């Protein structure tokens, strides 16, 4: 019997060859992880893609400094004033009356400012917005916001009007996350995780921007496709006859089954779950999915919608990785992105013949 503590044998030629193969795979895996991992954010307009990109900056790049936060003030003020103007105009269109003592404020918002707001939220303008937000007519109009185009952040900024109208106001990270501006062109966020470089590419989602998507399709490790769960009862900004959820389903089918992404991980973010959970208590998802006959609950409805998207996949060998998300909730996105990171890193290693 040989000495088990003696010098190890080199092994048979087969064992040596197998060991060399393993070392080669490890080298390939290390090389892949040291390379750049490209994540492509896709989805229709208003689905929350840009908010996800902002969260990556908060989570992985030390957030926004004061100068960067300050640069969002004008956007936030434009969102706030613009949203109130939308409500005032919608009230008139829907023939919902505004209190007599608030009609002058409504006129100033709708007529005097028009589309020429200069980005300065004066004390007088803030008071007009505060008074109108408390007006029963504006509240009734807000309850019917599925009938017109209103930013998701409207109520958040109206409720914060005293704070955001202070002379020394500096936007918080939450204020920045909720700010909305149309994404045009291509915006990239680069960050490091576990010695791997991630490049997240955000491309505008509205129809006019989608022609730019093809420029980003090469060397993509994973697609993160964002869908706004809460928009099952809304129409597109670009086309007021097309349901937003149906547009997202059609778009996901195209992206999921394109030859460009035949071997690319497909991650599905079912976003705005917080707004969705409130909305389904008032508006059934049958306004979009007439065939749905399940319970009108968050769990039942979200599971049904998730399955509708998974069913768009025509490749039985391709996996879809769905997640319910709230893009404005940093803790939720941290947890979800940790799962995404593990999926992506495992798939990257898998391509080299190794699994974590």
From Swiss-Prot:
Renumbered residue ranges of the record's region G4 motif: 267-274
Role according to the record: Guanine nucleotide-binding proteins (G proteins) are involved as modulators or transducers in various transmembrane signaling systems.
S-palmitoyl cysteine lipid modification positions: 5
Sequence positions that bind Mg(2+): 50, 183
Any one annotated GO CC term: cytoplasm
Listed SMART domains: G_alpha
Top-level taxon: Eukaryota
Name of the protein in question: Guanine nucleotide-binding protein alpha-1 subunit
Region described as G1 motif: 38-51
GO molecular function list: G protein activity; G protein-coupled receptor binding; G-protein beta/gamma-subunit complex binding; GTP binding; GTPase activity; metal ion binding
PANTHER family: GTP-BINDING PROTEIN ALPHA SUBUNIT, GUANINE NUCLEOTIDE-BINDING PROTEIN ALPHA-5 SUBUNIT
UniProt keyword terms in alphabetical order: GTP-binding, Hydrolase, Lipoprotein, Magnesium, Metal-binding, Myristate, Nucleotide-binding, Palmitate, Transducer
Region of interest: G3 motif: 198-207
